[in-house]
Amino acid sequence: MTDWKQYGPIYTIAPGIKKLGKLSIIEFDNEEERYLKLKKKSKENIYYDNLYDNKIDGKIVQKIKSILSQEYPNKNIAFQNFKEIGYSIQEDIAIFHRSNKLIGLHVSFPSLWIPKEKIGMSFSAIHQPVPGMEKIIENEKKYVDMMINAEQPIVRYVWGEHFSYLLSPLEPIDKGSKVIHTERQTFIGMPEDDLGIFLIKKKVMLFDDTDIEFQQWYKNQIISMSEDQKKYKIGI
């Protein structure tokens, strides 16, 4: 597991959005085969809003192909539509429209949320359950525009924990085993098409396998949470 040092010393719901810098937009690592196999076995992981049509599908395909051709010119990746894209890369994918609507989802590794419940929702409706999000929700137009207009991709990191499985429920483990998950969330704007692509790269690690440095950081995160945040984030 990587990325946890990106989150800062105390817990915050602030977006923490950064420029992508030298990172690749789409990431392939040594667990590519594991991710893709789990995706192909997943069920109830692909959803579309009525606003999503063939024209939008073609624009998304064109954009992802362009990114892959630049970042991985020698990698043989073939897909013809949004569904096939999701089975070709390790990231989960969400498509957001400038009208403030989530219109496409290909999500096999959700972190304690149910994809079919979010499709068609606005930015504020999606984030309503998260304690402390009030000010961000009040400024939802700002954040929607930021996603859609991010021609130079931007990135943020989030973390959480869950029990009973590793990357997905298709990898069950002992119910009492705590798993730490991190997500690298990358936003790719397509302003000329009023679209934003949202990539989610999830990584996991058993809490018992983390080192002392991480566990002290984790302890400080919990201490700094409000009671509502503890209940939402870790079920306390």
Predicted regions and their residues:
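Extended, well-ordered protein cores
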Residues: 1-236
